[in-house]
């Protein structure tokens, strides 16, 4: 009689590709062979899929997104994370397979979660958190994980983790010194990357971007697996074009970076609107030479989280997939949906499993 352990690797791989990442603990317990294959498949066989996490109604959900070679988009698989069912989360940060969860309406603790091992750990600070606190999680050269906490009283700060260090998109801040905003030329405000080195526990020098962005232009960061950093810039709409660029790092260190262009597309004939860096994120598929941008659609009647698939071939490939309706975050009693800047970013960075024990 054939048992589960007798199935060949191809059949097991097919089962694994249909298994939510948050259910792998059950799969790994079937037998030693399945446990070994699950690690091999996750760490070496997931190049064709995007794995990530998204927020829906203050709940953390896993997201599996397939993009086939013919650019046909499979419906995304979205599963609420059962281990976090009783917790309302306001934001999530990702670092090398670990997720840092900011708890909604709770200033006394944070939660670190390893989805692959299904382990959680509560972190309590010496002093209570503040509503303006920003966070990042990373590790030093000895793989000791640390949490960075700081305050920014202007805008939410976006960051991505690469090589254990955290990279921020930043702009030079002007001090008006009695002058009105109309008297200040902000078109030449310097923008750059900043790296927080978790080994040295300090910020490095300003790192150059491959472009100069202006006010109201969209700039957002992402990682290409564990190997490269990528940055998206969508230019301010101007006749006759609306250019979107994505650059990928060819070399990156805490004190140096170099770039190469990955994608450059005129978005005006494709979408007719500008992505919002406060509401979404993106990842790239280097084999198919496409980018997938997660954002909120531009309608004020009803808002949906949408995945936009963009390519450069054939004059600009474009497709979109509806992920789900966004809850109405507007003031009670008002008509319409909140502006994108009032909404929670829908998708976290792509996920690579970790064997780090935190429980």
UniProtKB/Swiss-Prot annotation:
InterPro entries documented for this protein: A_thaliana_F-box, F-box-assoc_dom_typ1, F-box-assoc_interact_dom, F-box-like_dom_sf
Pfam annotation, one family: FBA_1
Top-level taxon of the source organism: Eukaryota
Positions of disulphide bridges: none
Domain F-box: start-end pairs: 2-48
PANTHER family on file: F-BOX ASSOCIATED DOMAIN-CONTAINING PROTEIN, OS09G0372900 PROTEIN-RELATED
Name the record gives this protein: F-box protein At1g10895
């Amino acid at each position: 009689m054939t048992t589960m352990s007798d199935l060949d690797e191809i059949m097991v791989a097919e089962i694994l590709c249909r298994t939510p990442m948050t259910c792998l603990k059950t799969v790994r317990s079937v037998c030693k062979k399945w446990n070994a294959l699950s690690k091999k498949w996750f760490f070496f066989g997931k190049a064709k899929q995007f794995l990530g996490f998204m927020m829906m109604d203050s709940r953390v959900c896993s997201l599996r997104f397939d993009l086939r070679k013919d650019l046909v988009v499979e419906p995304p698989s979205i599963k609420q994370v059962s281990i976090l069912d009783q917790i309302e989360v306001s934001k999530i940060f990702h670092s090398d397979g670990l997720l840092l969860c900011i708890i909604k309406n709770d200033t006394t603790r944070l939660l670190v979660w390893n989805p692959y091992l299904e382990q959680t750990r509560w972190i309590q600070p010496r002093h209570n958190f503040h509503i303006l606190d920003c966070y990042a999680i990373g590790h030093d050269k000895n793989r000791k994980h640390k949490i960075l906490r700081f305050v920014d009283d202007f805008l939410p700060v976006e960051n991505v983790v690469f090589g254990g260090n955290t990279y921020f998109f930043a702009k030079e801040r002007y001090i008006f010194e009695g002058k009105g905003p109309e008297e200040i030329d902000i078109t030449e405000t310097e923008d750059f990357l900043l790296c927080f080195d978790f080994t040295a526990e300090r910020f490095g020098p300003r790192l150059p971007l491959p472009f100069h962005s202006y006010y109201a232009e969209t700039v957002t960061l992402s990682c290409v697996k564990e190997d490269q950093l990528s940055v998206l810039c969508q230019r301010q709409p101007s006749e006759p074009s609306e250019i979107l660029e994505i650059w990928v790092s060819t070399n990156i260190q805490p004190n140096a970076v170099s770039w190469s262009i990955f994608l450059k597309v005129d978005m005006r004939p494709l979408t007719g609107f500008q992505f919002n860096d406060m509401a979404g994120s993106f990842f790239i598929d280097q084999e198919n030479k496409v980018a997938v941008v997660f954002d909120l659609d531009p309608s004020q009647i009803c808002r949906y989280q949408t995945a936009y698939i963009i390519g450069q071939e054939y004059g600009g490939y474009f497709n979109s997939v509806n992920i789900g309706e966004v809850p109405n975050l507007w003031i009670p009693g008002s008509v319409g949906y909140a502006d994108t800047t009032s909404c929670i970013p829908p998708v976290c960075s792509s996920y690579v499993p970790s064997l780090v024990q935190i429980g």
